[in-house]
Amino acid sequence: SGDTILVDGELLPTAQAPRLWRYHKPKGLVTSHKDPQGRPTVFANLPDSLPRVVSVGRLDINTEGLLLLTTDGALARHLELPSTGWLRRYRVRAHMGSHSAITQRSLDALKRGLSVDGIRFGPNEAKLERTQGRNVWLKISMREGKNREVKRIAANLGLSGNRLNRTSFGPFALGVLKVGAVDEIKQKVIAEQLGGTVSRTLGVRS
């Protein structure tokens, strides 16, 4: 409402709307504030101008691409939920073993889901982008990013993934954002993507 609230003569701090950024995570950074092994972390390499943030999910140390960052833990948890329905899209470069061959038909089987070491993955979608010699480029889309899911799916197909890049998370795409750069998403855009009820609950300002 814009009213000023005083308690014992002190101005109460107004609730801050959650903020959200796109970040182009480089390969070789751990998605953690601290790493027991002393490896470089995402949060130690962010611009000093950023406030304290948490990540929306994680990317493996050898995975590059889009990582969403937010000042609000509740927003992060909401966006991580598979029930949100947002697709995570990856571009994968992998090497085919001497006895393996990948076709679109074999990739279409991922739509039914699969189990690896007792863990259920999918259903997921994968498209064969191109092949060059024993290398293959795939586009994989999933609604839930379990630990090392893309690499484990690739291994199940007889592939050895050697490059993994997340190109989008829900409606937010990596685009031409440079490696290591951050770009804040406007409040209006966040509100439009989350919908009115969720936005109001999380304190997003439209």
What do the PLM-derived regions correspond to, one by one?
Residues S1-S206:
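Basic, flexible Lys/Arg- and Gly-enriched helix-loop patches that mediate nucleic-acid binding at interfaces
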